[in-house]
């Protein structure tokens, strides 16, 4: 999360909520869950919530097997290490206010129906259990969400002259790449490509998918391979062939799902015809 906040400092608001897995007196879960939450909150009273939070997370192996009494001693020692007023921390740690706070956090989680931790909600949507919370996935969701602000609501109007020859130049780190656009063969694709280029869609993007001996793919500002302009247009099947290196075509996720992504062949690819 720290990496995400660093990458998107003006676009993410991170809200943390405790869900200490306390359990019930009859069926307790984690004997140190409540005290962990209380420790972070006690440190927070001195402006060091995240320092204690991070120490608990990073050093879990050191304290997870301790007794509750020894864990409390560990917390007090850690409070001194991170620069807290230890006496105040010790008083706050087991105060009735924080004991009640931890219990309420558990009760609220139960009422809400939380299944466990970690539990993540992004813009009101629960993060699916079958998708890992690794950085790439989280960053992709942020990038795709931000892309929505740039997307269009419909296909561009047809403005090109299908009798003319159009040439586009890709400016890359390796030098310029000139592309012939066949308006007579693929008017929808050419019209869309020019429209997107004129609106800065392709500025500063990368080739997010490069397969040596096959293709290099670009056209997604997020670099995830899932981004598009907000509209689709139909396939245009012509007599043109992917019979040599340097042929450009539209990349899609199935019939008639063309958008902004395109590929350039490294070698003949008759399977793409």
Task: Go through the PLM ranges and name each one.
Residues 1-6, 73-158:
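C-terminal cap of thioredoxin/glutaredoxin-like
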Residues 12-13, 85-92, 176-178:
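A local structural motif
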Residues 22-26, 64-65, 128-131, 258-259, ...:
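Extracytoplasmic/secreted cell-surface and envelope-processing proteins
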Residues 63, 93, 127, 231-235, ...:
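Short clusters of hydrophobic/aromatic residues that line enzyme substrate/ligand-binding pockets
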Residues 136-273:
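Cyclophilin-like peptidyl-prolyl cis-trans isomerases
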